[in-house]
Amino acid sequence: MKRLVSKIDKSVNFVNTTLGTECRYVRRNDKYISAYLSSHNGCKMACKFCWLTATNQTNFRHVSIEEYANQLDTVLSHGKEIDGENSRIVRVNINLMSRGEALANKNLVNNYDKFHKELQYIINKYDYSEMKMNVSTIMPKVVEHKKLIDIFGDRPVNIYYSLYSTNESFRKKWIPNSMRYEIALRKLREFQKETDNTIAFHFAVIEDENDNLSDVQSMAEIIRSMNFSKTKFNLVRFNPHPSMSNYKEPSVEKLEKIYEILQSVCNDETIKTNRSRIVPRIGQDVLASCGMFVDNDL
């Protein structure tokens, strides 16, 4: 196990060189820990913005429920060293946002109840106050035949949909293995009606690719038309792999304009915490920021 500690913000990237997974400890404030867990050892979803795609790390071994729990144990063992008895007032955000695609992990999809119980056990083991489950997904084609309620049941979960764009040419180029956005949005709306869960849209903005303001406005109107009861938008930062030097994030001014357009259709006034935002980068020096992963040879 390699332990990469950020000199920027004390984020820690735990790299299991035997299993090929990464789990991350991130602390944005004292109130909660963000534990980023891997769902696979690589990824074959072929998302163009992802470092796994750029470095051809396409092995797709499904992380077991035990491995998920072990990853969380690793992160919280580190967290407990810092928090001590104060852990009782600290929330743990479990973010399935590291390696792989959570909704393509057969162990999670077929036995979410057991998965949830095992991770809750680890939370209790370290005496943390509560667990919040956040699942990032491109809504892959492999679960197009499934209802989200059949996967998650009545267990609490927050879906973070990596929509990126409703422009089909962009989607074919950048997220080729995602289901059509129309299908994904219907599934998410149906899931929200059944659970009253917040639906979050989170994605990066890439200059000259998905930053056209007219396209963003169109995407916003499509989302508005779905009548989601509780939504939020997180614009995460684009961190292109060095081999993608011809792509970059637009200016901060452009990013803020895009955020304003999206926020105009957002119903997050009903959300008491963790509102829409432009998400700051974390742990870049240990490859812990969005879309970044260690190379095969580390």
Swiss-Prot record:
Residues of the Radical SAM core domain: 29-272
Name of this chain's protein: Uncharacterized protein R756
PANTHER family reported for this sequence: 23S RRNA METHYLTRANSFERASE (PTHR30544), RADICAL SAM CORE DOMAIN-CONTAINING PROTEIN (PTHR30544:SF5)
Alphabetically ordered keywords of this record: 4Fe-4S, Iron, Iron-sulfur, Metal-binding, S-adenosyl-L-methionine
Cofactors required: [4Fe-4S] cluster
A biological-process GO annotation: tRNA methylation
Domain of life: Viruses
Keyword Cell wall biogenesis/degradation: no
Species of the source: Acanthamoeba polyphaga mimivirus
Cofactor annotation remark: Binds 1 [4Fe-4S] cluster. The cluster is coordinated with 3 cysteines and an exchangeable S-adenosyl-L-methionine.
Positions of [4Fe-4S] cluster binding: C43, C47, C50
Taxonomic classification: Viruses, Varidnaviria, Bamfordvirae, Nucleocytoviricota, Megaviricetes
Any one GO molecular function term: 4 iron, 4 sulfur cluster binding
Disulfide cysteine pairs (residue numbers): none
